[in-house]
Amino acid sequence: MNKYLAELFGTFWLVLGGCGSAVLAAAFPDVGIGLLGVSLAFGLTVLTMAFAIGHISGCHLNPAVTIGLWAGGRFEAKEIVPYILAQVIGGVIAGGVLYTIASGQMGFDATSSGFASNGYGEHSPGGYSLTSALVTEVVMTMMFLLVILGATDQRAPQGFAPIAIGLCLTLIHLISIPVTNTSVNPARSTGVALYVGDWATAQLWLFWVAPILGALLGAVAYKLISGSNKD
């Protein structure tokens, strides 16, 4: 049970810290943190939680990561469903806390503001198409899993995995926020989309399918380049 609670709290922190920075601080007058700040916030949530709960649950915080680690031979199949449930619950609770905070500002409307939801077409920050969004999410998640599997390999330098993984997630956001608002994480997408409803839930399917496909490809890619299916 401890590891499931760890995943719940960890994903809560990722969604609250990452999406919270986007909703509350990104465009704050005069001192808004912007795209760079939001990207760093997402990376920092993973970095801090990796040190906090990595020894308890492995600090997946992401259904795609859980599935990718299973595909890479690093995780048991029987744990996939409870891990994903814990992650989604943590993300949804964080979305609720963030919604409560954001609602305290006069004129706030989750649907029109987007509430840090992921989207494509007219709901892409840069107006990118469904195809662009699909390719972006698949490739970004593939590379994320490649870094995770490599950084946590027993042959890799020890103790640096949280830094490599956190910086990788930061870089992913720097690249892809303009395209999809960056998901690479179905729990992150679900955690805020449910409070927007409308277009956000209608487009949510992509942000489950693409990251999971990307994670599977990342696991295959790492097996190809690592020369071993084992740690």
UniProtKB/Swiss-Prot annotation:
<dbReference type="InterPro" id="IPR034294">
    <property type="entry name" value="Aquaporin_transptr"/>
</dbReference>
<dbReference type="Pfam" id="PF00230">
    <property type="entry name" value="MIP"/>
</dbReference>
<feature type="transmembrane region" description="Helical">
    <location>
        <begin position="159"/>
        <end position="179"/>
    </location>
</feature>
<feature type="transmembrane region" description="Helical">
    <location>
        <begin position="8"/>
        <end position="28"/>
    </location>
</feature>
<feature type="site" description="Selectivity filter">
    <location>
        <position position="188"/>
    </location>
</feature>
<feature type="site" description="Involved in tetramerization or stability of the tetramer">
    <location>
        <position position="19"/>
    </location>
</feature>
<keyword id="KW-1003">Cell membrane</keyword>
<comment type="subunit">
    <text>Homotetramer.</text>
</comment>
<keyword id="KW-0677">Repeat</keyword>
<keyword id="KW-0472">Membrane</keyword>
<feature type="transmembrane region" description="Helical">
    <location>
        <begin position="205"/>
        <end position="225"/>
    </location>
</feature>
<feature type="site" description="Selectivity filter">
    <location>
        <position position="182"/>
    </location>
</feature>
<keyword id="KW-0812">Transmembrane</keyword>
<dbReference type="InterPro" id="IPR023271">
    <property type="entry name" value="Aquaporin-like"/>
</dbReference>
<dbReference type="InterPro" id="IPR023743">
    <property type="entry name" value="Aquaporin_Z"/>
</dbReference>
<feature type="site" description="Selectivity filter">
    <location>
        <position position="173"/>
    </location>
</feature>
<keyword id="KW-0813">Transport</keyword>
<dbReference type="GO" id="GO:0005886">
    <property type="term" value="C:plasma membrane"/>
</dbReference>
<feature type="short sequence motif" description="NPA 2">
    <location>
        <begin position="185"/>
        <end position="187"/>
    </location>
</feature>
<dbReference type="InterPro" id="IPR000425">
    <property type="entry name" value="MIP"/>
</dbReference>
<comment type="function">
    <text>Channel that permits osmotically driven movement of water in both directions. It is involved in the osmoregulation and in the maintenance of cell turgor during volume expansion in rapidly growing cells. It mediates rapid entry or exit of water in response to abrupt changes in osmolarity.</text>
</comment>
<dbReference type="GO" id="GO:0015250">
    <property type="term" value="F:water channel activity"/>
</dbReference>
<protein>
    <recommendedName>
        <fullName>Aquaporin Z</fullName>
    </recommendedName>
</protein>
<feature type="short sequence motif" description="NPA 1">
    <location>
        <begin position="62"/>
        <end position="64"/>
    </location>
</feature>
<feature type="transmembrane region" description="Helical">
    <location>
        <begin position="80"/>
        <end position="100"/>
    </location>
</feature>
<feature type="transmembrane region" description="Helical">
    <location>
        <begin position="33"/>
        <end position="53"/>
    </location>
</feature>
<dbReference type="InterPro" id="IPR022357">
    <property type="entry name" value="MIP_CS"/>
</dbReference>
<keyword id="KW-1133">Transmembrane helix</keyword>
<comment type="similarity">
    <text>Belongs to the MIP/aquaporin (TC 1.A.8) family.</text>
</comment>
<feature type="site" description="Selectivity filter">
    <location>
        <position position="42"/>
    </location>
</feature>
<keyword id="KW-0997">Cell inner membrane</keyword>
<feature type="transmembrane region" description="Helical">
    <location>
        <begin position="130"/>
        <end position="150"/>
    </location>
</feature>
